[in-house]
Structures are given as structure tokens and as C-alpha cells.
């Protein structure tokens, strides 16, 4: 059975809304990537070294990342040889299969959010300004509420003009309380208040916003360390998630940001925003494979429910949906 057929069976068991969101959200990447792959397989009669060289360029242009592309091409060559594949069209299914394998290989890291019943779950959102961090917090609060959890938001970005007000708008929109102080206050003090407010309300989840820019990078990272210490002191083993918000449209720049933040704080997962706004959705694989950080959330559109938990099969379906849907029944 081809991988596309297996994927089709798995996707049909999912709720339609999830698979459709990945399909819609990855439309730009799919159109660009699939068109290039279709063009490639139509021009070649056989799978040879020239074919793989061109495929390499297609994958790099999708921001899959050089190291990951080299690994993927090596795996494809072995698989093509093992299965004695001659027809370039048959390689498409193998590409999708290997993309899922590469994402799932390596470090055993869980893609699901670390949310457990019977405790206050503390989620810290970090990232530079302009990547959609506050919007992600608002959408995540909505998602948690839809799942029946009580949520509190902490307006820990006291530095950026308008950040507190922006979070308050999301609080009103989602019906979630926002704990805040005045602009310029000590972020650690805001988080301290928020932890106690969340405990007093017996909340399930506390989501904390943080500054994305201070006078310099050293100050920003020190601020994050201080906030983390406050959380650790008040809630043992917290924060349970430190999610780094990255803008998918910035490509390799996002990789550089991830490296910087990983040095300063223990990033447990990536919230990849604006994936619907780029034709270079391969960044997901580069982050996972080269930085060894799982992508936990993806922004697939403008709507409040367009933030989804990342799933590698749904992602590959989004890239190859036209071919998956044509798979033999």
C-alpha cells in the first residue's frame, strides 16, 4: 500500500476541520512546492543523479534547511534503490513518507502540549516583537477554553507600547481574565501576581506574555530568567511549557532567533505563526531536525480557531493533499 493511501485512511479518520485547516493553511507552500515537484517528475523519464540534484534545489527553496535536505536526499536514494523505483512519479509518495519519518526521528520529544489535570499548568510565551506572540496567546486561550479549561492570562510584556491593551482585547474576546500592572512595571512582579490570581481562581492554565525587546539582548534574556525563577518558586516544576513564537514567513531568520532563545532559556516547543502566509513551509522540518525542538502549535490563518496543535501527518497531507486525495481507494 502506498504511503499516500495510508495517509488518506488516517486523515479520513480525523475530524474534517483539522485536515482542512492544514490543507488551507499550507496552500501557498503546497502550490509552490507541488508545482515544482510536478514539473520535475514530468521532465524526467528515470530517477537519476540529475533528478536528485534538482529535487535538492526544490527542497532548499521551500526552506527545509540544507542539513535536513541532505539527510532527506540520502534517505530517498536508499529507498529508491531498495524498492527499485524507476518512475519519477513514484518518488512523490516516498518523499512524503520520509518527511514524516525525519520529523518523528531523533530525540524523543513530545509534540503535544504538556497540560495535565489536577494542577495549575503554566505556559510561558517568548519571542521577539512582531512575530504574533500576543495573538498566539489569545488564540491559545480560546483553544483551551473550548476544551473546557479555565484560563488566566498574564500581561508580562510591560515594555512594548500597547502590549497590555492588546492582551486585554484578547481577554475580552475570549472571556478570560487578564492580570496586569501599568506599563513599565517589573514583569516578574506581574507574573507573581498572575500565579497567585490563577491559584485563587483554581485555574487550569496560566498563559504568560513576555517582552520581545528590551534595551539590549542581554537585558531581555536576564528578564526571562528572572520571570522563570519566579514561576519555579511559586509552582514546582513550572513553567510546564516555554513556547517560542516564530514567524514562518521569516524563514532562516526564524532559525537564528530559535538558536538565540534556546541559549537563554529551555525552550520546550515552537509556536510557528503565519504558516499560511508563506510558500516556504519547509521551515517546520528544519526547526525540528536541526534545532531538535518540536513544533507544538501552528498558526494556519487569521481566525481565532486557526491555531492548531502540530501533527506531522496532517502537515504532509497539507503539502500533498491533491495527490493523497487521488490515492487509489
From Swiss-Prot:
Similarity field: Belongs to the GTP-binding SRP family. FtsY subfamily.
Disulfide feature: none
Any single Gene Ontology cellular-component annotation: plasma membrane
Alphabetized CDD domains for the sequence: FtsY
Localization (cell): Cell membrane; Cytoplasm
Enzyme type, top EC level: hydrolase
SMART domains from the UniProt entry: AAA, SRP54, SRP54_N
UniProt GO BP: protein targeting; SRP-dependent cotranslational protein targeting to membrane
Descriptive protein name: Signal recognition particle receptor FtsY
Organism field: Bacillus subtilis (strain 168)
Keywords: Cell membrane, Cytoplasm, GTP-binding, Hydrolase, Membrane, Nucleotide-binding, Receptor
Membrane topology: Peripheral membrane protein
Positions annotated to bind GTP: 127-134, 209-213, 273-276
InterPro entries, sorted: AAA+_ATPase, P-loop_NTPase, Signal_recog_particl_SRP54_hlx, SR_rcpt_FtsY, SRP/SRP_N, SRP54_GTPase_dom, SRP54_N_sf
GO molecular function, one term: ATP hydrolysis activity
Amino acid at each position: 500500500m502506498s504511503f499516500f493511501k495510508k495517509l488518506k485512511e488516517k486523515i479520513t479518520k480525523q475530524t474534517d476541520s483539522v485536515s482542512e485547516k492544514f490543507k488551507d493553511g499550507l496552500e501557498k507552500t503546497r502550490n509552490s512546492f507541488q508545482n515544482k515537484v510536478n514539473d520535475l517528475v514530468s521532465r524526467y523519464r528515470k530517477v537519476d543523479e540529475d533528478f536528485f540534484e534538482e529535487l535538492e534545489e526544490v527542497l532548499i527553496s521551500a526552506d527545509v534547511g540544507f542539513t535536513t535536505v541532505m539527510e532527506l536526499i540520502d534517505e530517498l536514494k536508499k529507498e529508491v534503490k531498495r524498492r527499485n523505483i524507476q518512475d519519477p512519479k513514484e518518488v512523490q509518495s516516498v518523499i512524503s513518507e520520509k518527511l514524516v519519518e525525519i520529523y518523528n526521528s531523533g530525540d524523543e520529544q513530545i509534540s503535544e502540549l504538556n497540560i495535565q489535570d489536577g494542577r495549575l499548568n503554566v505556559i510561558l510565551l517568548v519571542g521577539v516583537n512582531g512575530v504574533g506572540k500576543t495573538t498566539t496567546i489569545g488564540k491559545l486561550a480560546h483553544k483551551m477554553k473550548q476544551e473546557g479549561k479555565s484560563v488566566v492570562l498574564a500581561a508580562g510584556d510591560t515594555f512594548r507600547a500597547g502590549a497590555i491593551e492588546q492582551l486585554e482585547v484578547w481577554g475580552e474576546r475570549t472571556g478570560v481574565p487578564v492580570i496586569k500592572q501599568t506599563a513599565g512595571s517589573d514583569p516578574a512582579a506581574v507574573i507573581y501576581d498572575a500565579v497567585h490570581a490563577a491559584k485563587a481562581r483554581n485555574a487550569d492554565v496560566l498563559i504568560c506574555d513576555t517582552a520581545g525587546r528590551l534595551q539590549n539582548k542581554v537585558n531581555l534574556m536576564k528578564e526571562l530568567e528572572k520571570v522563570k525563577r519566579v514561576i519555579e518558586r511559586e509552582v514546582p516544576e513550572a513553567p510546564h511549557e516555554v513556547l517560542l513564537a516564530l514567524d514562518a514567513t521569516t524563514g532562516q531568520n526564524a532559525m537564528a532567533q530559535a538558536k538565540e532563545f534556546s541559549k537563554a532559556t529551555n525552550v520546550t516547543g515552537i509556536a510557528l505563526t503565519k504558516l499560511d502566509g508563506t510558500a516556504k513551509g519547509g521551515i517546520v522540518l528544519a526547526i525540528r531536525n536541526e534545532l531538535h525542538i518540536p513544533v507544538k502549535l501552528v498558526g494556519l490563518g487569521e481566525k481565532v480557531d486557526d491555531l492548531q496543535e502540530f501533527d506531522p501527518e496532517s502537515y504532509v497531507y497539507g503539502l500533498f493533499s491533491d495527490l493523497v486525495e487521488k490515492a487509489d481507494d
